[in-house]
C-alpha cells in the first residue's frame, strides 16, 4: 500500500507554485487535491503526485461520563431524578477499596481494535478481522478504499494480572462476545441451567461503527502537513456494557444478633454474556458471585444500624443494552425481563450458627437496569435466631422491601 510522504507532498506543492500562474491563490492541501485537475491544465508537475491506495484515519475514542451520578441518570415515575448517594448508607472506606477496588468505573487507557473491510458494500458480512492495539485514545493506520466496520473495546487490566472476562472472536467474524466462567460456589436461586455461580466481569466499554466510507474523492479528509498524510477523523464513543450494582442489607435493631457475613454473595437472574458490537446482553440467566463485608454502627439518617454491603459488576439484565434502553423507550422507567432476581447472603449469628438469607430484589434490578443501589432492610426483632444443631440454621426467603416490607421465612 503506497502512502503519500511529506517529501512528495511538499515537492508537489513547490512544483505547482513555480509552474502555475501567480494570480492563483495558494489553497489548503485538502482543497488543493480536489481542484488540481481544472487548475493545472498546461502546468508541468514534477515529481508526479501518487496518492496512497487507501486512506489514513485517526480514530479518537472518547468515553461516556463515568461518574455514577451522571451515568445513573434514572428518572422516577414521579419525574424525580435518581440520587444514589441518598440511598447508599454502607459507604466505601479505604479497606473496602483494598478488598474490592474502586466504587465506580475506572478510566481505561488502552484499547483493542478490530477492523473489518467490506469492499464496496457497506455493512456486508465480515470475512477477515485486522487487529490493532492502542495505548492512549488515538489509532492511526491505513485503510484500503471502500467501506469498513470498526469495533473497539478497552484492554482489561487487573491488580493480579488475572482477568475473568473471556472474549469469543472465533464463533463468528460478525461479532465479538464477552463472557465469564463458573466459580466453585453453588448457585441455588434462579439459575436453572447452571449449578454454580459465575465470576463477575471487569469493567468493559465498547464502541462499534459500520459503513465507514474511505473514498478516493477524499471526502471528509484533510491533509496533515507535519506528518505528510491525508487524515479522516472518526469519533467513537465508548459506552459501558458492564454495570455496577451496590448492594446493602441494613439490619435495624440487630443488637449483636448477626455478627458477620460469609464474604460471598450472589445476585441471580443476570446475563451470562454480552455482544460487544450491539451491547445487548445474552439470554442465559446466571447468578453472579461477588464479595460483601459486614459493618457495625453505620449512620442511617441518625439511626445506628449494621450493614452487609458489597459491589458487583455484571453484564446486566438478559436481552437488553442497559446503556441505551431508556434512549430507545421514551418514558419507560423499568425493564421487565420476565425473570426473578434474588440476592443471597450467608450470615453468622451470635450463637455461631449461620443462615443464608435470600432476598427477592426483582423490582429493584428491573428499575435499575444499568446498575444502581439495591437495598434490603431487616428488622432483626422479627427475625428468629437459628438454633438447630449441626452448625447450619435456616434459609430465609425475604421479599423485596419495596413490595410492602414484610418478611416471609421458609423455615
Spans of model-derived segments:
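Short, low-hydrophobicity acidic/polar segments
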Residues: 119-239
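Sec-dependent bacterial lipoprotein signal peptides
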Residues: 1-42
